[in-house]
Amino acid sequence: LVDRHCKPLSLSEKYKENPDAMFVLWKDHTAEHEAAEINNADRLSGKGYSRHSGGHYSAECFWAKVLRVLRHSPELQNEASTAIELCDWIPAVLTGVDDITKMRVGLCAAGAKRMWAEEWGGYPPEEFFNGIDGKLVPILRNMPDKVYGCDKEAGRITAEWADKLGLSRDVLIGIGNIDSHSGAVGAGITLGTMAMNLGTSACFMAITRKNPHVI
């Protein structure tokens, strides 16, 4: 959860000791109940908003985690402008973005974690989220609706960060991307091949001309 200046609430004095104000680790499964609610709402809608993530919305994904946090620590709702992925926040920090409306977010996490898709015009509509829990609507409204591929730039590194990291001030920062997806690209994945990313989890990535609706 971040304020309108893209600052995580956990970096404020008021919430620095509140775990719900911090980034939530991907493998946290405390939002199983919320994920089940989202899956039920998706089935009832008949729209298939989770079709590009295997037809099932996981507790490891964005909306389930956000809803669980807002229910567990409702006081954060008044302070939060929206919620963002870590892979989107870091490029914003490095490029000096301090306005949520000017932040460039990546297509990768939006599609895999937040049910964004061109075919329904971006994110699912407000009515879908309101039917699950109205707490999600302000988060949706304040979220940047334009997304960018990882081949695009987020901006130029700030002088402060360039000097701190010992980099040229001409360095361009790329759009954020999910690590396992980036690993597949780095491994040289091509049509008809599979890349296995092994770490704290195992992600098997493949490219096919077919559209099985599985990530």
What residue ranges belong to the model's regions?
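Glycine-rich beta-strand-to-loop/alpha-helix junction loops that act as flexible
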Residues: 1, 150-152, 198-200
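Glycine-rich loop at the start of a catalytic domain that most often binds anionic cofactors/ligands
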Residues: 2-15, 188-191, 209-210
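Gly/Ser/Thr-rich active-site cleft segment
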Residues: 4-11, 39, 46-177
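Short helix/loop capping segments that flank catalytic or ligand/cofactor-binding pockets
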Residues: 10-11, 34-35, 93-94, 101-102, ...
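Short, acidic/small-residue loops that bind anionic groups at enzyme active sites
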Residues: 13-16, 20-25
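Short coil/turn connectors at secondary-structure junctions
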Residues: 20-22, 78-81, 142-144, 168-171, ...
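Carbohydrate-associated surface elements
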Residues: 28
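Catalytic phosphate/nucleotide-handling subdomain of diverse soluble enzymes
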Residues: 171, 176-215
